[in-house]
Amino acid sequence: MRRAETIAEIRAAVRELRYRENPRLKGETWGTRSIGFVPTMGALHEGHLSLVRAAKAECDAVVASIFVNPTQFGPNEDFGKYPRTVEADCALLEREGVDAVFLPQVEEMYPAGATTWVEVEELSGRLDGASRPGHFRGVATVVAKLFHIVGPDRAYFGQKDAAQVANLRRMVRDLDFDLEVVVCPIVREADGLAMSSRNRYLSVEERRQGLVLSRALRAMEAGHAAGERDGRRLLAAGASVMAEEPAVRVDYLRVVDPETLVDVEAVSGPALATVAAYVGATRLIDNVLLGETPAAFKL
């Protein structure tokens, strides 16, 4: 696995990967190879590795990135303590057969004097964007830069970050990026907790409390499966479960359109039940799709 720390190095690595011998092309020995891209902030777990495996299955070569992006953290958030386990992460990526990994420093991605931002208006202020002002502007900016630098054919993201996915899909469409955003299902621990790099912040008791998020979503999912289509009643079912853990502070509990993130009052098509809550000092998010999987979330 090739490790690149500069933009020039990763571009050279991708160029070599794209034009290397391609056994998938019948009757030819050389030709353009497809590139799958998995951008991460590191502290990798099985959720990230599921994205790598999906990319490996669909693309000729896979590139990953590890970059803790400062512009998507607020002033009182966990940028300083976000887990940084680069060597362990690289070992996992190499084991999974990743071809190259981009490991830039902040100065490489945001050189002195940089003043350009990318923001998806309206969407960037919904769900997580409402409680974390500037978060999705930071996400869209760094991902746009990574797409421009790597130039992948497909980029892989997890459904757990559904609001991020909605922002990035709109950005890709509006700015005419020539790539496909692929969304992979949430990977959960055996007890139902959605995998997250931030789970390592939780104490044993907080981890137990955090299970209320997935329980609330399952209650909403069960209500929908039983025929309930009133968004307010579905929310009430979820809120009732969340109340079982009074120490958990709910940021939001919503039923929304998965593409626009607008609240859905009457569920007549695909919808997303989504929750964010603070367990101790740790903010957790989770979601579940209601009804048929929308096109935006299909593999």
UniProtKB/Swiss-Prot annotation:
Its EC number is 6.3.2.1. GO terms for cellular component: cytosol. ATP binds at residues 41-48, 158-161, 187, 195-198. InterPro entries: Cyt_trans-like, Pantoate_ligase, Pantoate_ligase_C, Rossmann-like_a/b/a_fold. GO terms for biological process: pantothenate biosynthetic process. One of its GO terms (molecular function) is ATP binding. It is found in: Cytoplasm. Its main location: cytoplasm. Beta-alanine binds at residue 72. Gene3D superfamilies: HUPs, Pantoate-beta-alanine ligase, C-terminal domain. (R)-pantoate binds at residues 72, 164. Signal peptide: none annotated. It catalyses: (R)-pantoate + beta-alanine + ATP = (R)-pantothenate + AMP + diphosphate + H(+). The reaction proceeds by a bi uni uni bi ping pong mechanism. Homodimer. Catalyzes the condensation of pantoate with beta-alanine in an ATP-dependent reaction via a pantoyl-adenylate intermediate. This is Pantothenate synthetase. It comes from Acidobacterium capsulatum (strain ATCC 51196 / DSM 11244 / BCRC 80197 / JCM 7670 / NBRC 15755 / NCIMB 13165 / 161).
